């Protein structure tokens, strides 16, 4: 397979097509957001609470709103209000919650319910997919 070369100018041009709208949870530095943009999507907002990650994201995509709180505190109403949209109007609610507790390479069930170091915090991460499911239920993306 031949590599696909791109730069931020191309990403911006492709994103201006506005073919679909996206909010990305657990966005990190913007890997999935870049893919959506290259596919012609408009990333309206992201959620990321790790400072180094959201600062990197903001440097690459300064026009995207960043919800900087823990996803557990993010509510559908926050998204609707900030983006001036209603339930069911967003096309894609993307999320990549930490998965080490489920991974064959990770500790799997043995670590379930335990707090562990995640970036510069100590917290449970195995339950974050429930938060993603909650937001999918409440936002009701198309």
Predicted regions located by residue number:
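Conserved active-site and SAM-binding loop architecture
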Residues: 1-142
